[in-house]
From Swiss-Prot:
GO terms for cellular component: nucleosome; nucleus. This is Protein H2A.6. A motif (SPKK motif 1) lies at residues 129-132. Abundant in meristematic tissues. One of its GO terms (molecular function) is protein heterodimerization activity. Its main location: nucleus. Core component of nucleosome. Nucleosomes wrap and compact DNA into chromatin, limiting DNA accessibility to the cellular machineries which require DNA as a template. Histones thereby play a central role in transcription regulation, DNA repair, DNA replication and chromosomal stability. DNA accessibility is regulated via a complex set of post-translational modifications of histones, also called histone code, and nucleosome remodeling. Keywords: Chromosome, DNA-binding, Nucleosome core, Nucleus. InterPro entries: Histone-fold (IPR009072), Histone_H2A (IPR002119), Histone_H2A/H2B/H3 (IPR007125), Histone_H2A_C (IPR032454), Histone_H2A_CS (IPR032458). It is found in: Nucleus; Chromosome. It comes from the Eukaryota. Residues 120-148 are annotated as: Disordered.
Amino acid sequence: MAGRKGGERKKAVTRSVKAGLQFPVGRIGRYLKKGRYAQAVGSGAPVYLAAVLEYLAAEVLELAGNAAKDNKKTRIIPRHLLLAVRNDQELGRLLAGVTIAHGGVIPNINSVLLPKKAAGAAEKESTKSPKKKAATKSPKKKTAATKE
């Protein structure tokens, strides 16, 4: 007969594997249903949401890894996450209301508070007349004492 009673079972293929994702499609689908966001949840919604979340996570981790490398570190810490998110215009706007614990602050010094000698020195150099060449010394004349 056509039944498979004693045969080997096929290994289950998850929806995450079918979609080529690392994030769990089944778990996200379960959360969507349990959260009562809508009366029904389509079969493609958890796949799409998992793909979006995976993309955002990859983007943040890549930028945080670059920030860690810039600081000569091999481990990503919350400070690197904050620097990555706040220095990226789109992610900064998306996560504008988010506080990252132990992230610190973005370094920023108001331009009014910066010393003016760098700008002042450049202006002084341009207003000064061109420097004259230093006079070269003529060779010493031999005197009676040096002739001996």
